[in-house]
Amino acid sequence: MCDSKDNSGVSEKCGKKFTNYPLNTTPTSLNYNLPEISKKFYNLKNKYSRNGYGLSKTEFPSSIENCPSNEYSIMYDNKDPRFLIRFLLDDGRYIIADRDDGEVFDEAPTYLDNNNHPIISRHYTGEERQKFEQVGSGDYITGEQFFQFYTQNKTRVLSNCRALDSRTILLSTAKIFPIYPPASETQLTAFVNSSFYAAAIPQLPQTSLLENIPEPTSLDDSGVLPKDAVRAVKGSALLPCIIVHDPNLNNSDKMKFNTYYLLEYKEYWHQLWSQIIPAHQTVKIQERTGISEVVQNSMIEDLNMYIGADFGMLFYFRSSGFKEQITRGLNRPLSQTTTQLGERVEEMEYYNSNDLDVRYVKYALAREFTLKRVNGEIVKNWVAVDYRLAGIQSYPNAPITNPLTLTKHTIIRCENSYDGHIFKTPLIFKNGEVIVKTNEELIPKINQ
């Protein structure tokens, strides 16, 4: 096994050391750190009236007289309770999502009333108006805990119109005025959790160690194909269903049965080529690494994230609010570039300086991301092959006195200039050693 002896990376028996290599760690991700309100759908009620709320689905809300609420195209009465989950963002705010339809609270400003904005139900987009700060408090008379929701840097507070009557309660946000709010306003903005449903949350797998590069056992042994390679789990994260596109489930079913999806990050040795090279002969071999544009676009569509040219993670609007939690769980860094990783095709010339024919098999490190539902079903996976980490095994290896030599290296195509580097040649491949491309070993490609 390729075990790590310190924080610098791979141990000597696995090859050359290098930094920033994913180490074996225990899962420290979302389902171990989430607050209860992010693991349950609570029936949100006003503290004083104990009534539920109504929610609009209209795209054109308008205000009603002086009430801190608005008229709605669809209303729910107290006999139709709504259950809400609060997805925790990296900055401590929440996305408030409805179990019934999978949509989220959205503060929709209206030009008719600048003081009161309606809360409507919309698809999650990652916009600021869908993010709420929850602040806990307590009643100085009863001692009962309650909480309030703020938007726009605490300049607006979620308000529960008609909180003291038995009719349907409508939600809005009210502008916070100076000094102290009237008692009625306090009553309108105080909420408590009532009954709940548990969210559907998958378990995180244990991490594992990456095995050594597979060795061929005969001249006829062509090595291990990618589909048969042993995977090592290096990290995993829970993805709120609101950022995931599942082609087989609508928003409502995702919210009820897959409140969170599991994204696993695995590594394995991906075979680039396998060939018998005759004694004292040179062969030309084409190597294809990186990730195709089709695969990147699929990852963007389904996860709203993608892989950067430095193999770090990049995020779009839906996923960006959760990026710190996701990268921490996956044990992957944020990308230091905005350039998207592309496909890389190289032509290599290898020379066998031995007095016998040798079977050589070359592998590169593959970084695989797999999206799973709560029941373990695989939705999709994405693989990026890292050209910077590669090694060769051979058969026979005991009689060999001279290692394989890379005599010429040419880039045929790389889809971005960020990874447009070549090896200094000649380069010696020792059997089973992981060759690491560092800045000192690379010659920058000259831009034409």
UniProtKB/Swiss-Prot annotation:
**Compartment(s) where it occurs, according to its Swiss-Prot or TrEMBL record:** Spore, Perispore
Q: Is Transmembrane one of the keywords?
A: no
Instruction: Please provide, alphabetically and separated by semicolons, the GO molecular function terms listed in this UniProt record.
Output: toxin activity
Q: Which UniProt keywords apply?
A: Disulfide bond, Sporulation, Toxin, Virulence
The principal localisation class reads other
Subunit architecture: Forms a heterodimer with BinA. Upon toxin crystal solubilization with NaOH at pH 12, only the 63-kDa (binB) and 43-kDa (binA) proteins were detected. Interacts with mosquito protein Cpm1 which acts as its host receptor.
- Per the record, what about its domains? Has an N-terminal beta-trefoil domain and a C-terminal pore-forming domain. The trefoil domain has barrel and cap subdomains; the cap has 3 possible carbohydrate-binding modules while the barrel is involved in host cell receptor binding. At neutral pH the carbohydrate-binding modules are accessible on the toxin surface but the barrel subdomain is not. The crystal is very stable at neutral pH, upon ingestion by larvae the crystals dissolve in the alkaline midgut.
The job of this chain, per UniProt, is described as: Component of a binary toxin active against Culex and some Aedes mosquito larvae. This subunit alone has no toxic larvicidal activity. This subunit is responsible for localized binding to specific regions of the host larval gut. Binary toxin internalization into host gut cells requires both proteins.
Instruction: Please identify the protein, giving its name as recorded.
Output: Binary larvicide subunit BinB
Q: What gene is this protein translated from?
A: binB
